[in-house]
């Protein structure tokens, strides 16, 4: 019977074993900036997918994703052997590596948010000295001689008679 809790524990353990082996035991220079971010194990415990990110050598340099993928593919057998020796389970899961795109998407979202903030600041600067176009109440009609008197001729003026008047 599949046990999801056991699969999660096994995935966490596999993640630490593989990350440690990549950092300390595998001497492939293509794996220098590889970090294991997550691991998923199927409920039957036969397959494990490890998600990784690759860091560039400097902030300006683009990471070598193809080289890291080739290095992980080459080291897959050695890593599976180390996982099997450390876990002590009857069947050692097969390892598959997938590039984790979450950090890239997060950087893209941060850039979009920064761009939106800059646009908001530009709009706020433009808005500072602006005033409304026209009068405060464009539908208000002032009476003769009244500067601030009641409106005349508008819909709020009492009707002296006509279709809307009631009998008194």
Swiss-Prot record:
Subcellular location(s) of the protein: Cytoplasm
What keywords are annotated for this sequence in UniProt? Cytoplasm, Ribosome biogenesis
Origin, by domain of life?
Bacteria
Q: What's any GO biological process attached to this entry?
A: maturation of SSU-rRNA
Q: Which InterPro entries match?
A: KH_dom-like_a/b, RbfA, RbfA_dom_sf, Ribosome-bd_factorA_CS
Supply one GO CC term from the record.
cytosol
* Stretch forming the signal peptide: none
Basic and acidic residues bias (residue ranges): 125-138
GO molecular-function annotation terms? ribosomal small subunit binding
Concerning Pfam families, the annotation shows: RBFA
Query: According to the UniProt record, where is the region Disordered?
Result: 125-168
Q: Which family does it belong to?
A: Belongs to the RbfA family.
Function as written in the Swiss-Prot or TrEMBL entry:
One of several proteins that assist in the late maturation steps of the functional core of the 30S ribosomal subunit. Associates with free 30S ribosomal subunits (but not with 30S subunits that are part of 70S ribosomes or polysomes). Required for efficient processing of 16S rRNA. May interact with the 5'-terminal helix region of 16S rRNA.
State the oligomer form and interacting partners: Monomer. Binds 30S ribosomal subunits, but not 50S ribosomal subunits or 70S ribosomes.
Instruction: Tell me what this protein is called.
Output: Ribosome-binding factor A
